[in-house]
Amino acid sequence: LRAVLRMLPEDGEVTVAELIPAVVRWNRDPALGLGADCLADPRVTIVEGDVVECLEAGAGRFDGVILDVDNGTSALTARGNDRLYRATGVGLVRRALGPGGIAAYWSAHHDPAFVELLEGSGFEVTVERVRPHAKARGGSHHVLFLAHAVASGSRR
């Protein structure tokens, strides 16, 4: 969120959907040093609820959608999260994006089948392996699926 806010214009808006109210409380607590300053930014709206509901209500509204749900596309720990990584969920994200929008999916692992699903749903996809944070050395990497919405019948 902090990185998004750094790049966002003053008249921009960010909607954060968080299913677990305790996560919002933790992030609002300045003593924990997690993100209270970000959540207090007037450009940020917090929705305590399911991201699916935000996406359904936002058809064509978003320039970008960032999904960091569970462990990603296949290493799921919570039932029901898989719906975001199936055709219906990817279609929902696609419809929520405005022209030229981009969706970023965080995952613990690379998933070629998910890339195929995204491409078949009207996205051009780039896969990036990134470190958990800027100062991380060695160890694990995360995977970002960057899905650029393309107009029907065209490719970037």
Could you describe each region identified by the protein language model?
Residues F145-R156:
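C-terminal lobe and adjacent flexible extensions of AdoMet/dcAdoMet transferase-like proteins
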Residues A108-H110:
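Active-site beta-loop-alpha junctions enriched in small/polar residues
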Residues P112-V115, R156:
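Class I (Rossmann-like) S-adenosyl-L-methionine-dependent methyltransferase catalytic domain
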Residues L1-L97, Y105-W106, E116, S121, ...:
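The AdoMet/dcAdoMet-binding core of the Class I SAM-like
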